[in-house]
A protein has these predicted regions:
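An interfacial alpha-helical scaffold signature
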Residues: 1-195
Length: 195
């Protein structure tokens, strides 16, 4: 995770716009494109960061940094992990006022996260062992406002794990075939009946 990094996801933003334009029944091709881009993307997640400060006044995000990610609670009580697609969207969020304004902790500092980080954050039980009640992820809240429920995060994660397992099995199969234990004959090899 990097602190206050410049991030841009033009393909993901484009696919999000396609899905929004699709309305209530998104095109399956757009959904598949969204899942692919989601997996490739780096996001900016609001965070309260406790870290040592370097000589230049910047926080040092090394192994000793602690992050607290604020959770956005909707009017219906559902809790969301918030991420932004790019720095321009964070700046828009910082400039918002009124009912759509995010609390200050959502727009102060950001760290980069990948989808796999987000999945771990919302699918892992709380430190005390209780169920994590986060409903899902919201991308660009009060703007594009794309919601990815926890069950979809779990499905995408399981799909990625299945694909990785299939790739490993394919590689293992190729290696098993190429590691034929029979001896390759060459002059002077006594195992092949040559003297």
């Amino acid at each position: 995770m990097e602190l206050n990094k410049t991030v841009s996801n033009p393909m993901l933003v484009g696919v999000m716009q396609l899905i929004k334009a699709d309305g209530k029944t998104p095109d399956p091709k757009h959904q598949e494109m969204f899942m692919e881009e989601l997996d490739k993307a780096e996001f900016l997640a609001p965070a309260e960061i406790k870290a040592e400060v370097g000589p230049d006044g910047e926080k040092l995000v090394n192994g000793k940094a602690q992050f607290r990610f604020p959770i956005l609670t909707g009017a219906d009580g559902r809790r969301f992990f918030v991420v932004f697609t790019d720095n321009a969207t964070v700046e828009k969020a910082q400039a918002m006022e009124g009912a759509s304004a995010l609390p200050e902790e959502f727009v102060k500092e950001t760290v980069t996260v990948k989808f796999s980080d987000l999945a771990r954050f919302i699918l892992t039980p709380n430190p005390d062992g209780s169920e994590n009640t986060t409903y899902g992820i919201v991308i660009n809240p009060f703007m594009e406002n794309i919601v990815i429920p926890k069950n979809l995060v779990a499905a995408v994660t399981m799909r990625k794990q299945k694909e990785a397992k299939e790739k490993l099995e394919k590689v293992a199969s190729v290696l098993a075939k190429s590691a034929d234990p029979k001896v390759i004959p060459f002059p002077g090899n006594k195992d092949e009946g040559q003297d």
